[in-house]
């Protein structure tokens, strides 16, 4: 996960928390409206259970005397207004839930993509070999020399030269000593070339040129 993802994650978490808080506020308001609707229905129930549609006049067309007409009309009006408010509020709740689910789905997709990327990076890291540290570098090779025949190349970094390695290397004289004692004998040489490790077989031999190798080796500054 990159550093840029951290503020993005924090921003997403804050946005989700705000969305959840908004939904909770809407749900509280919904419960309040439903309680108010019930209270007004209770008023109608107290008036002979008159309900929302029963007539407020008697069979002769006169206002009913057995109920409080003002309370009934007020309760009916309140119920209609509150039901409209409830309907609009439920639409807000539905939209808020839809947005929250969409945000969660987007976050889930982003988390899955990040998890896949992290897993891929771990696989790449585990598959990438850890290259040993080199102690010297080849800076010149003569054509036709034992070093050239063995496959050494300019800029090869030497990790192991016979018995000389990073742990016991002190100076190029160590390499010279091994070469002098190995004339005509094969030496295992390990080099790093363009990020890859190569194993070579070098035989120090007298040839037309100078020395037994025909190459120049310089120590690496660490």
From Swiss-Prot:
What the entry lists under InterPro entries is as follows:
Nas2_N (IPR040815), PDZ (IPR001478), PDZ_6 (IPR041489), PDZ_sf (IPR036034), PSMD9 (IPR035269)
| Phosphoserine PTM positions | 128
Q: Which residues form the PDZ domain?
A: 108-194
Q: Name one Pfam family in it.
A: PDZ_6
Q: Which residues form a coiled coil?
A: none
Annotated Gene Ontology MF terms?
A: bHLH transcription factor binding; transcription coactivator activity
- Is Nucleotide-binding given among the entry's keywords? no
One of the GO biological process terms? positive regulation of DNA-templated transcription
Q: Does the keyword Phosphoprotein apply?
A: yes
Summarize the protein's role.
Acts as a chaperone during the assembly of the 26S proteasome, specifically of the base subcomplex of the PA700/19S regulatory complex (RC). During the base subcomplex assembly is part of an intermediate PSMD9:PSMC6:PSMC3 module, also known as modulator trimer complex; PSMD9 is released during the further base assembly process.
Family statement: Belongs to the proteasome subunit p27 family.
Q: How does it assemble?
A: Interacts with PSMC3. Part of a transient complex (modulator) containing PSMD9, PSMC6 and PSMC3 formed during the assembly of the 26S proteasome.
Name the UniProt record assigns to this protein: 26S proteasome non-ATPase regulatory subunit 9
Q: List the source organism.
A: Mus musculus
């Amino acid at each position: 996960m990159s550093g840029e993802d951290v503020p993005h994650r924090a921003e997403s978490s804050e946005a989700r928390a705000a969305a959840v808080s908004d939904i909770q506020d809407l749900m509280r308001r919904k419960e309040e409206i439903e309680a108010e609707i019930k209270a007004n229905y209770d008023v109608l129930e107290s008036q002979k259970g008159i309900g929302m549609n029963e007539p407020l006049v008697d069979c002769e067309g006169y206002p009913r005397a057995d109920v409080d007409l003002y309370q009934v009309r007020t309760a009916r009006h309140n119920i209609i207004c509150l039901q409209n408010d409830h309907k609009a509020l439920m639409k807000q709740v539905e939209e808020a839930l839809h947005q929250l689910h969409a945000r969660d789905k987007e976050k889930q997709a982003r988390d899955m993509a990040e998890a896949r990327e992290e897993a891929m990076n771990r696989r790449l890291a585990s598959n990438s070999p850890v290259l040993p540290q080199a102690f010297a570098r080849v800076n010149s090779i003569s054509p036709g020399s034992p070093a050239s025949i063995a496959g050494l190349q300019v800029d090869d970094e030497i990790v192991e030269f016979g018995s000389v390695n990073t742990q016991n290397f002190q100076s190029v004289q160590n390499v010279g000593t091994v070469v002098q004692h190995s004339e005509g004998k094969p030496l295992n040489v390990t080099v790093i070339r363009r990020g890859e490790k190569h194993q070579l077989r070098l035989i120090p031999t007298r040839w037309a040129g100078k020395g037994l190798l025909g190459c120049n080796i310089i120590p690496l500054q660490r």
